[in-house]
Amino acid sequence: MADRDATLWASHEKMLSQPLKDSDAEVYSIIKKESNRQRVGLELIASENFASRAVLEALGSCLNNKYSEGYPGQRYYGGTEFIDELEMLCQKRALQAYHLDPQCWGVNVQPYSGSPANFAVYTALVEPHGRIMGLDLPDGGHLTHGFMTDKKKISATSIFFESMPYKVYPETGYINYDQLEENASLFHPKLIIAGTSCYSRNLDYARLRKIADDNGAYLMADMAHISGLVAAGVVPSPFEHCHVVTTTTHKTLRGCRAGMIFYRKGVRSVDPKTGKETYYELESLINSAVFPGLQGGPHNHAIAGVAVALKQAMTTEFKIYQLQVLANCRALSDALTELGYKIVTGGSDNHLILMDLRSKGTDGGRAEKVLEACSIACNKNTCPGDKSALRPSGLRLGTPALTSRGLLEEDFQKVAHFIHRGIELTLQIQSHMATKATLKEFKEKLAGDEKIQSAVATLREEVENFASNFSLPGLPDF
């Protein structure tokens, strides 16, 4: 019995020390396949990026082992002195990265990601069934900003709060601030959200703040997509005008998957007659909404990864990278325009563009599937004026990930031509099908036609040969 227990215990110790490739060949194989897909493919999904080796090392550290419910100095567990040190360092760097005075701003770095961060703000500042206004999802907003259809409330935000979206002009794709102002005066929201997931122009934060002030509302910026650009100072910052700013940390900021909530603190206003000061109470409201309101223990390994990313975001190299992201996006937009494609709003101020395929006679869902088969990853997206979200007309394309791999403007001109050839192939497939053929039938034709598969293979080989010339950031084994 003792010999058997000793053998089992030795086997147990071996299990704890084995590398992944020996411990779990199936998971290791999947990771290797995904690593190869990223290496040989062109990643154009605007919300994706390639985290640095240092960020991934922090993410895979022993910090994963530690529970630490609560906040620095106020934990519900012992053994958290170094966790406190880490979280306070991350908070300090977050304020430094965005040039914020710690007397006027605070930050919570515990949200698990952007969606929980947003919901924590709503929970903190808007009573149940209180009113929220965000950019409509089909017009470039995010699901968490209150999306619902005529028949169904989709996002939990629209279930637990009353949501009224604001819109863009269908003709230009630009936000209709006049209509927002008019609707806000009737709806009287408690919170207005300045944030997007597919909008290629800078937001008018000053105009949004005035609308918020006129209606006694808070203004919250969701800068998830542009947080790296904001840190580098290459796009307008929301901090001058907003009461609260939320963000993810894995898009243009190029960290691991997590979220942050910045909030104003200190003096909010001074009575001109009495001189009495009124103070912000956002800190306690937001912190209690994150924990214990919506979350348990923070993910300390992720907080470490965020801290590393924030340090990198304060470097000259990071600013050069973000400037290149913008230059590459302009190059991609210009090249596609020259090839005859319509870009919503006519261009971009940031890291993404939305390509409208209606004039070409196809849609985003079909083009996405063909491009994916050719090792080009992007995503279908609704365009202003789309009749159905089930058949979006556009493709959203972003430059952060490929810029992290070292692609420059001339490289994105080649990428544009690869995209063009993929869409031409999409149209070729459609020409051999009924006008009302479903997406399912289209995918069957794409997968089952030998001639089409041969054309796909030819383009895929060219794409993969091109992409393989650029290194992939991250851990060397993966």
From Swiss-Prot:
> What InterPro entries does the annotation carry?
PyrdxlP-dep_Trfase, PyrdxlP-dep_Trfase_major, PyrdxlP-dep_Trfase_small, Ser_HO-MeTrfase, Ser_HO-MeTrfase-like, Ser_HO-MeTrfase_PLP_BS, SHMT-like_dom
One GO BP annotation is:
purine nucleobase biosynthetic process
Q: Which GO terms describe its molecular function?
A: glycine hydroxymethyltransferase activity; mRNA 5'-UTR binding; mRNA regulatory element binding translation repressor activity; protein homodimerization activity; pyridoxal phosphate binding; serine binding
Q: Its catalytic activity?
A: (6R)-5,10-methylene-5,6,7,8-tetrahydrofolate + glycine + H2O = (6S)-5,6,7,8-tetrahydrofolate + L-serine
Name the needed cofactors: pyridoxal 5'-phosphate
A cellular component term (GO) from this record?
mitochondrion
Say yes or no: keyword Phosphoprotein present: no
- Extra remark beyond the main annotation: In eukaryotes there are two forms of the enzymes: a cytosolic one and a mitochondrial one.
Subunit annotation: Homotetramer. Identified in complex with FAM175B and the other subunits of the BRISC complex, at least composed of FAM175B/ABRO1, BRCC3/BRCC36, BABAM2 and BABAM1/NBA1.
What protein am I looking at? Serine hydroxymethyltransferase, cytosolic
Question: Which species is listed as the source?
Answer: Mus musculus
Q: Which gene encodes it?
A: Shmt1
